[in-house]
Amino acid sequence: MTITANKRHYLEKVSHQGIISALAFDQRGALKQMMAAHQEGEATVTQIETLKVLVSEELTPYASSILLDPEYGLLATKVKANQTGLLLVYEKTGYDATTTSRLPDCLVEWSVKRLKAAGADAIKFLLYYDVDGDEQINLQKQAYIERIGSECTAEDIPFFLELLSYDERISDNNSAAYAKLKPHKVNGAMSVFSDKRFGVDVLKVEVPVNMAYVEGFTEGEVHYSQAEAIKAFQDQEAASHLPYIYLSAGVSAKLFQETLYFAAAAGAQFSGVLCGRATWAGSVPVYITKGEDEARKWLCTEGFQNIDELNRVLEETASPWTEKI
């Protein structure tokens, strides 16, 4: 795979020695729910913006880049560490739960040109994709991604495509029924969007198994033997020639770190992570119930510990994206 000099420059800005240790704080709908669980009434704009600022101030010195949204995160972009790169999201949060299509939608007041002008070093877009889903729906999704890829090509800025797999007939992605399908769903979507017509530079993906059902990782029911889980990671590596990074999917910091060791041992040559809730989630109840100062203390201690431990794991497990580009 080859990229332009400008795209390479931007990728270098969001990584450290080819490893992407990025902090994800583009959550909007999920963050509102987390905040609402600890107070009466909905979270305010000020509450959301302030927590994003706190996280950016305290944790970006230890991350190669931070992922933020232009809806609530622009203030946070102003206080990140100088050497830390910036990814901005282009998609609206959430999806229409009344239909199985989960069609994508851009933030209507933004374009790649405007996100770049706001300081982005890369653009991230999230797509829900069922590789076995309705053919017409998938054609619409593919065309949508082609448009975004073309925008990023025109602006000469890296395109990070986040793929979240699902099955149109299964409502619970954490179920045993979906766990059996997950390797095929995750790896199949990666294969589709690795085609150069989509203009994707880096894939942000799920691990291809639900670790809660892997032999040795669960005390409950097992749906993958160790050998089956290893094969799923090997198939993932074979599914794309593009650099790819893992998302934390809201699991605990400990499980995410253990997963990265397992993935690397299986042969997955991932180039880093975009890790969100596994790093900062514990700050939310502290911020809501005890205020800014206590939240800052949590971020400086437990938040720092989470990100520092993750960085150490990445040093041992991740492969530089420069090996693929």
UniProtKB/Swiss-Prot annotation:
Domain of life: Bacteria
Catalytic reaction equation(s): D-tagatofuranose 1,6-bisphosphate = D-glyceraldehyde 3-phosphate + dihydroxyacetone phosphate
InterPro entries, A to Z: Aldolase_TIM, DeoC/FbaB/LacD_aldolase, LacD_aldolase, Tag_1.6-dipho_adolase
Keyword terms: Lactose metabolism, Lyase
Pfam families: DeoC (PF01791)
Pathway: Carbohydrate metabolism; D-tagatose 6-phosphate degradation; D-glyceraldehyde 3-phosphate and glycerone phosphate from D-tagatose 6-phosphate: step 2/2
Keyword Ribonucleoprotein: no
UniProt EC number: 4.1.2.40
Record GO terms (molecular function): 6-deoxy-6-sulfofructose-1-phosphate aldolase activity; tagatose-6-phosphate kinase activity; tagatose-bisphosphate aldolase activity
GO BP annotation list: 6-sulfoquinovose(1-) catabolic process; D-tagatose 6-phosphate catabolic process; lactose catabolic process via tagatose-6-phosphate
UniProt-listed NCBIfam families: lacD, PRK04161.1, PRK12399.1, PRK12858.1
Family, similarity comment: Belongs to the aldolase LacD family.
Protein name: Tagatose 1,6-diphosphate aldolase 1
Taxonomic classification: Bacteria, Bacillati, Bacillota, Bacilli, Lactobacillales
